[in-house]
């Protein structure tokens, strides 16, 4: 339970999310959660190569021309599956659990449902400033500061 107290940190800041598990090396896109920190990893949100992989065929702007703010916006839109410009609990869940395996890395054990719920609750509690149950882009961007 004490480790769940650490999940109250700001949404995208631990960062994004610290991706270190003792004895294992893995990277999760969209989440710096390795069972102890919460938020989206800033390095993931700003990872041009990863974002461009997901946006291949969607946008034609060269990645070298994208500002950090444009990368943030594209990252947000990548996880806004219903296109309502808000991230709900389910969209946050998929962002948190979106795992990218690196060659030669060990697989991180899956997060329990209770851990995932606690993280999402913490994100909404800390970053949903208007208490509407969603993270809008302004709240998302502020959580990355």
UniProtKB/Swiss-Prot annotation:
UniProt-listed PROSITE patterns: EF_HAND_1, EF_HAND_2
Disulphide connectivity of cysteines: none
Subcellular location per the Swiss-Prot or TrEMBL entry: Endoplasmic reticulum-Golgi intermediate compartment; Endoplasmic reticulum; Golgi apparatus
Domain called EF-hand: residue spans: 67-102, 115-145
Keyword Glycoprotein: no
Keywords: Calcium, Endoplasmic reticulum, ER-Golgi transport, Golgi apparatus, Metal-binding, Phosphoprotein, Protein transport, Repeat, Signal, Transport
Phosphoserine: modified positions: 105
Listed GO MF terms: calcium ion binding
Positions of Ca(2+) 2 binding: 128, 130, 132, 134, 139
Signal peptide start and end residues: 1-26
Entry GO terms, CC: endoplasmic reticulum; endoplasmic reticulum-Golgi intermediate compartment; extracellular region; Golgi apparatus
InterPro entries for this protein: EF-hand-dom_pair, EF_Hand_1_Ca_BS, EF_hand_dom, ER-Golgi_Adhesion_Reg
Superkingdom classification of source: Eukaryota
Sequence positions that bind Ca(2+) 1: 80, 82, 84, 91
Pfam families: EF-hand_7
Gene Ontology annotations of biological process type: carboxylic acid metabolic process; protein transport; vesicle-mediated transport
Main function: The MCFD2-LMAN1 complex forms a specific cargo receptor for the ER-to-Golgi transport of selected proteins.
Assembly notes: Interacts in a calcium-dependent manner with LMAN1.
Protein known as: Multiple coagulation factor deficiency protein 2 homolog
Natural source organism: Rattus norvegicus
């Amino acid at each position: 339970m004490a480790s769940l107290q650490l999940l109250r940190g700001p949404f995208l800041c631990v960062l994004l999310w610290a991706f270190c598990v003792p004895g294992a090396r893995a990277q999760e896109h969209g989440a710096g959660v390795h069972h102890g920190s919460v938020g989206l990893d800033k390095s993931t949100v700003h990872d041009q190569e990863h974002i461009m992989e997901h946006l291949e065929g969607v946008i034609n702007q060269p990645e070298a021309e994208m500002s950090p703010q444009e990368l943030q916006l594209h990252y947000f839109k990548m996880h806004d599956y219903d296109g309502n410009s808000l991230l709900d609990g389910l969209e946050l869940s998929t962002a948190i659990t979106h795992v990218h395996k690196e060659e030669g890395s060990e697989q991180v054990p899956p997060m329990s449902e209770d851990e995932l719920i606690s993280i999402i609750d913490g994100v909404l509690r800390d970053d949903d400033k208007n208490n509407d149950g969603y993270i809008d882009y302004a709240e998302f961007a502020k959580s990355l500061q």
